[in-house]
Regions:
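Positively charged n-region of N-terminal signal peptides that target proteins for export
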Residues: 1-4
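Bacterial N-terminal signal peptides
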Residues: 6-14
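Sec/Tat signal peptide C-region and signal peptidase I cleavage site
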Residues: 16-20
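Accessory carbohydrate-recognition regions in carbohydrate-active enzymes
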Residues: 21-207
Length: 207
């Protein structure tokens, strides 16, 4: 009889822990640290990126190979994170290796972006206005409404891959842009029609 009670107790405990872990995600906002510091000591060590936590609203698996984040900054340069809260336009969604809290450069990254209407490929030209009120950022799910294209973008990730969904509120042409983020102009894209694959390359440059 004792073994039955113990088994029942273990089952109830495991169920409670699993339920708690799921519910706790709703309290996590991965945008924390992407805005400038406003404390009394803000700017003590500099007035540029030193004022930021240098974090990013990434979706990822624990100990994953890479992660995905909205992109508001078009560069892999040192000390510039892919996303800052102050920015008003999103350029796409980046597969990133950014080291959170640091000042080393991103590397080997690429960005996906959807546009509608006239095709625009350059990051600053294709960037869409967005509102933080229409944005949701958790470790497992990110969503934002792209005002310029009347489309909602959603993404989630595994350790080496991601799943995207783009929902359009108007009819017409829609495009998916694949952009290797090489500041040295060394990135490239290959389209294999036979295998139905798109392969991208972006050589790594680290400081």
């Amino acid at each position: 009889m004792r073994s039955i009670y113990i088994l029942l107790l273990c089952f109830l405990c495991s169920f409670s822990v699993a339920e708690a872990q799921i519910l706790l995600q709703q309290y996590i906002d991965t945008r924390v640290g992407t805005a400038a510091n406003t404390t009394a000591s803000a700017g003590t060590f500099g007035k540029h990126t030193e004022e930021y936590g240098q974090t990013l609203p990434a979706v990822l698996m624990p100990h994953g190979m890479n992660f995905w984040t909205p992109q508001t900054q078009d560069t892999e340069n040192k000390c510039i994170a892919p996303y800052y809260y102050k920015d008003s336009k999103i350029q796409g969604f980046r597969n990133s290796h950014w080291i959170v809290g640091g000042c080393t450069q991103d590397y080997g990254s690429m960005t996906l972006m959807t546009v509608t209407g006239n095709l625009k490929t350059q990051p600053e030209q294709r960037a869409s206005i967005f509102s933080h009120t229409n944005e949701m950022a958790t470790p497992s799910y990110y969503s934002v409404y792209l005002d310029d294209y009347q489309a909602r973008a959603e993404m989630t990730a595994q350790s080496r891959s991601a799943i995207f969904r783009f929902t359009y509120d108007k009819e017409g042409m829609a495009y998916l842009i694949v952009n290797p983020n090489s500041d040295y102009g060394q990135g490239s894209i290959e389209i294999d029609l036979a295998k139905k694959e798109i392969r991208g390359y972006n050589l790594v440059h680290r400081l």
